[in-house]
Amino acid sequence: MSVDTQKVIEDNKRSAQDTGSPEVQVALLTARIELLTGHFKTHKKDHHSRRGLLQMVNRRRSLLDYLKKKDNERYKSLIEKLGLRR
């Protein structure tokens, strides 16, 4: 079980060579967060990985805040595309 990084990048890139835009970073973090969330359904006591999950959630939150501040339209389309609350 792992994230298909190339597929996530392909689905969210803004240009042909784009791998580091906030949209791509948020999409990759979202995919990893969803994967870890499923992991915790069976491994309830895995607190070490839970800390990593919280770090990813916080990083995604800061990237989303940055994107919202820079370009609100891109922010709105991204959260709608990824199905995030807000």
Curated annotation (Swiss-Prot):
Compositionally biased residues, Basic and acidic residues: 7-16
Gene3D superfamilies: 6.10.250.3130, S15/NS1, RNA-binding (1.10.287.10)
Positions of the UniProt region annotated as Disordered: 1-22
Stated role: One of the primary rRNA binding proteins, it binds directly to 16S rRNA where it helps nucleate assembly of the platform of the 30S subunit by binding and bridging several RNA helices of the 16S rRNA.
Residues that span the membrane, as ranges: none
MF term (GO), any: structural constituent of ribosome
Family membership: Belongs to the universal ribosomal protein uS15 family.
Keywords: Ribonucleoprotein, Ribosomal protein, RNA-binding, rRNA-binding
CC terms in the record's Gene Ontology section: cytosolic small ribosomal subunit
Pfam families, sorted: Ribosomal_S15
Domain of life of the organism encoding this protein: Bacteria
Keyword Transport listed: no
Subunit structure: Part of the 30S ribosomal subunit. Forms a bridge to the 50S subunit in the 70S ribosome, contacting the 23S rRNA.
Name of the protein this chain belongs to: Small ribosomal subunit protein uS15
GO biological process, one term: translation
PANTHER family to which the protein is assigned, alphabetical: RIBOSOMAL PROTEIN S15, BACTERIAL AND ORGANELLAR, SMALL RIBOSOMAL SUBUNIT PROTEIN US15M
PROSITE patterns (alphabetical): RIBOSOMAL_S15
